[in-house]
A protein has these predicted regions:
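Active-site-proximal, substrate-binding regions of enzyme catalytic domains
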Residues: 1-204, 215-277
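Conserved residues at the C-terminal ends of beta-strands
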Residues: 212
């Protein structure tokens, strides 16, 4: 099964943070301490349902390692990850999981380029509130795509050789009305990047777009009920627990790191091989 993983999936796959362990008796002529580095579990989300979705990522990771799932990402999702703090690799639900890259429906750099940091921005409310330049952002590009009609698309295709469009991207331009309708149904420019992810997943014939965000699954259900979009390949948007039920997994694997417990780093190496490797 081909599954595209949303940026938030990776952002919540790291369950531990490194800390200095509790102080024991001091020793030696220099009154040395015997604290050691180790790991504790990150603070649980106050929304228990949301936390249960996060906990299910360990099972998703196992299924990827067992090759029951083929996991994918792509450049626009990776740009979003630039705003994410790199977490601790110990107790990572996706440790040892293979991920493949797929092409975006349209490569933004074919149409615009510039400062890398500006290019990686989403361009949403938070960026605008901070006074950041959003002219090269995801949302700005996607707003532009929504303004294109058949005449514009024909003109772009005439410049194919100059732009270096691939056959895949030419197919996307001819399918652009699908993306435009997705954006219209999403009802907010803040949702345009998610609609681009879904469109890219459809163009790459993904079976599932996996996300933690309930809002995105609700938009997808609205799209299904609307039945006004001609989609070349149906990609289902699911959260982790729904996805596991689809695969026949009734009970997710237990999370191998307990809240409130300290795991010394040297003891971590003795844990089951699939954890953190």
């Amino acid at each position: 099964m081909r599954v595209m993983l949303d940026n938030g999936i990776f952002g919540h796959s790291q369950f531990a943070e490194s800390v200095l362990g509790p102080q024991g008796p001091r020793f030696g002529i220099h009154d040395q301490d015997n604290q050691v580095w180790g790991f504790v579990r990150k603070t649980l989300d106050p929304d228990r349902e949301y936390q249960s979705q996060i906990d299910a990522l360990f099972t998703v990771g196992r299924l990827i390692r067992e090759k029951r799932i083929e996991a994918f990402t792509y450049c626009e999702l990776m740009f979003e990850s630039f705003n994410r703090v790199i977490g601790e690799t110990a107790f990572d639900a996706f440790a040892g999981c293979a991920r493949s890259d797929c092409p975006p429906a349209l490569m933004r750099s074919r149409f615009r380029g510039g400062d890398g940091f500006a290019f990686a921005r989403k361009g949403g409310k938070k960026d605008r509130k901070r006074g950041l330049d959003t002219g090269l952002s995801q949302i700005d590009f996607m707003e532009w795509l929504c303004t294109l009609d058949d005449r514009h698309i024909a003109a772009i295709l005439e410049c194919n050789a100059i732009l270096g469009l691939t056959e895949f991207e030419i197919g996307s331009l001819r399918n652009l009305s699908c993306f435009q309708r997705l954006c219209a149904i999403s009802q907010s420019q803040e949702n345009y990047p998610d609609m681009f992810h879904l469109w890219t997943a459809q163009r790459n014939r993904m079976d599932v777009f996996l996300t933690l965000e309930k809002k995105l699954t609700q938009i997808f259900k609205h799209i299904e009920h609307a039945r006004i979009i001609e989609i070349e390949h149906q990609t289902t948007v699911l959260r982790p627990l729904e996805f596991l039920r689809l695969l026949g997994v009734a009970e997710p694997d237990p999370v191998p790191i307990e809240p409130g417990r300290f795991y010394p780093a040297h003891e971590f190496m003795k844990l089951p091989q699939w954890v953190g490797k």
